[in-house]
Design a protein with these regions (language model features):
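C-terminal segment of classical bacterial N-terminal signal peptides
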Residues: 13-21
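Bacterial N-terminal signal peptides that target proteins for export
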Residues: 1-8
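A generic "folded-domain core" signal
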Residues: 22-171
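Intrinsic disorder/low-complexity segments enriched in polar/small residues
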Residues: 3, 21-22
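Intrinsic disorder/low-complexity segments
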Residues: 8-11, 23
Length: 171
């Protein structure tokens, strides 16, 4: 699935603490491999690289929903490498968590804030990225502020190549 609106919309959500900076920057697409696309932009603190994918399947009884995305970000100036983030396309239920399943044994729990879900810390991100490299599909289950359960399925085809690409681009 091509990510045509992600360069700008993705940045607004991914870097919500840096919204003004993100709006001022236009991300540059640097590579694409199967389901994943890599981007970079110059932030106030230096170069930022991220990779993104949209779900190949969405399930849930919702009437209106924005576009969900899975993202992995490197911010070398902040010593952040492989930060995993999911954008739901809706506001999560307050205090809820998101379950990410990769393969038969890889289940991860992420905390939510607004329309985004994050790992609790960098070691958790590293474990999740490692599982994403090994897997071929990833399922993300969340609950909206209205109580609607959603299940998004992502292809992990091209994930490893794009992770290597953003790691080379943002060391």
């Amino acid at each position: 699935m091509k990510l045509t609106v992600l360069p700008i919309m993705g940045l607004i959500f991914v870097f919500s603490p840096f919204i003004e900076e993100a709006r001022a920057q236009t991300p540059k697409k640097i590579d694409e491999k199967r389901a994943w696309t890599a981007y970079t932009f110059k932030g106030k603190g230096g170069k930022v690289c991220y990779m993104a994918s949209a779900p190949i399947k969405q399930k849930g009884k919702y009437k209106v929903r924005g576009q969900p995305y899975a993202l992995v970000t490197n911010r070398p100036s902040e010593k952040i490498k492989g930060e995993v983030n999911f954008i739901a396309g809706y506001t999560f239920k307050k205090g809820s968590s998101v379950k990410v399943k990769i393969g038969k044994k890889g289940v991860f729990e992420l905390f939510t804030e607004g329309d985004a879900a994050w790992s609790k810390d960098q070691p958790s991100d590293l474990k999740l990225v490692k599982a994403m490299k090994k897997g071929n599909r990833m399922t993300v289950v969340g609950r909206s502020s209205r109580g609607t359960k959603t299940t998004d399925t992502y292809s992990l085809s091209g994930f490893t190549a794009m992770k290597k690409r953003i790691d080379r681009e943002c060391k």
